[in-house]
């Protein structure tokens, strides 16, 4: 089997050689970036963070994190519409990430728990889904919450 590879240009990483099978297709794009449909996940070494890099625009890359690493009790149900759209057949098909905003004052780093990125890892399809759940904020302050969890 021949695996097609592409060179993806990235402002963060320079040139990345990416297998076509690692490209994730977001049919609806990501809110505010609806015109961008193809992304690839790049792992940061020795870090809980990943990058969701646009294949189509080198300047667009989101820092993302697995929310279960920072909030082990994070849970939600996906509606059938999303399950069908992503062709999910089992929980093993799914990877969940949340977008991270890291401002100049790193202590103000926040995670969007309200709108996780759901990926079917086998079908390479993704969506950013807005949860109808008041438990999860748009701005979950990472360091503030980690410190309060450690004190418990």
Swiss-Prot record:
Coiled-coil stretches: none
Source organism superkingdom: Bacteria
Cross-referenced Gene3D superfamilies: BH3618-like
Main localisation: cytoplasm
InterPro entries: Flagellar_assembly_factor_FliW (IPR003775), Flagellar_assmbl_FliW_dom_sf (IPR024046)
GO cellular component terms attached to this protein's record: cytoplasm
Gene Ontology BP annotations: bacterial-type flagellum assembly; regulation of translation
Entry keyword annotation includes Cytoplasm: yes
Assigned keywords, A-Z: Bacterial flagellum biogenesis, Chaperone, Cytoplasm, Translation regulation
Pfam family, one: FliW
Signal sequence extent: none
Compartments, record wording: Cytoplasm
PANTHER family membership: FLAGELLAR ASSEMBLY FACTOR FLIW (PTHR39190:SF1)
HAMAP family for this protein: FliW
NCBIfam families: PRK13285.1-1 (NF009793), PRK13285.2-1 (NF009798)
Record-stated family: Belongs to the FliW family.
Function: Acts as an anti-CsrA protein, binds CsrA and prevents it from repressing translation of its target genes, one of which is flagellin. Binds to flagellin and participates in the assembly of the flagellum.
Subunit composition and interactions: Interacts with translational regulator CsrA and flagellin(s).
Protein known as: Flagellar assembly factor FliW
Organism: Caldicellulosiruptor bescii (strain ATCC BAA-1888 / DSM 6725 / KCTC 15123 / Z-1320) (Anaerocellum thermophilum)
Taxonomic lineage: Bacteria, Bacillati, Bacillota, Bacillota incertae sedis, Caldicellulosiruptorales
Gene assigned in the entry: fliW
């Amino acid at each position: 089997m021949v695996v097609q590879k592409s060179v993806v240009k990235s402002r963060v990483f320079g040139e990345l050689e990416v297998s076509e099978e690692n490209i994730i297709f977001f049919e609806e794009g990501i809110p505010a970036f609806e015109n961008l449909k193809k992304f690839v996940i790049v792992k940061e070494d020795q870090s809980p963070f990943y990058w969701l890099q646009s294949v189509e625009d080198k300047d667009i890359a989101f820092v993302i994190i697995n929310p279960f690493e920072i909030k082990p009790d994070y849970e939600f149900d996906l509606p059938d519409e999303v399950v069908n759209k992503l062709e999910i057949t089992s929980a093993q098909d799914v990877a969940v990430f949340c977008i991270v905003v890291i401002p100049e004052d790193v202590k103000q780093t926040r995670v969007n728990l309200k709108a996780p990125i759901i990926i079917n890892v086998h079908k390479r399809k993704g969506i950013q889904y807005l949860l109808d759940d008041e438990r999860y904020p748009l701005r979950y302050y990472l360091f503030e919450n980690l410190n309060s969890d450690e004190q418990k």
